[in-house]
Amino acid sequence: MIIPLAGHKYLEVVEVLDHPASDKAPFGQAVRARSAAGGGWMGWCVEVDDLAPFEERLGRAAVNGNRKFPDGRELVWKQIGILGLIADPQVPYMLKWQGDPSLHPSNAYDSSLKMSCLTIAGSASRVTEWLGEPVEKPLEDVAVEWVAPHGTPGILSVTFETANGAVTL
């Protein structure tokens, strides 16, 4: 399920598919691993204009992704970094959208819901190293609270600004 957010952002709710193909794809593996750990926030993603620096740094090519709509339209992108997310859930994976920009998930319908804060167990310096730029740059207007509890790194909570005030999940 896609939930469009303000500012060219969106939230995607995913679940494990009981299909052999989902176990072969890194994204399916990431979803299954998070589900097996009790569920919660699987990870986060950063939209980039150029995947080449990430391909070079990670030593592998980005892979194609797509989603077909019932009316035949197709959303297409390239992605890299899911394996990194599986190994270290504090780091994002990267997407480069291709094709028709009107199909971007944030455009599914108008939304005033705004993501305002991520609470991440981990290290800003580790994520900056992963991104190759200060972690604040791709997050723009989203605050990040870095905490380091004993346990697995990753997203602990997300705060959204709604018409009725802040909601933290």
Q: What residues fall within each predicted segment?
A:
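Extended intrinsically disordered, low-complexity coil regions enriched in Ser, Thr, Gly, Ala
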Residues: A124-E140
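Compact, glycine/acidic-enriched structural inserts
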Residues: G38, V46-E47
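Short, His- and charge-rich active-site/binding loops that engage polyanionic ligands
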Residues: V13, P20-D23
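Short, surface-exposed ligand-recognition loops at beta-strand->loop->(often short) alpha-helix junctions
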Residues: V48-D49, L118-S125
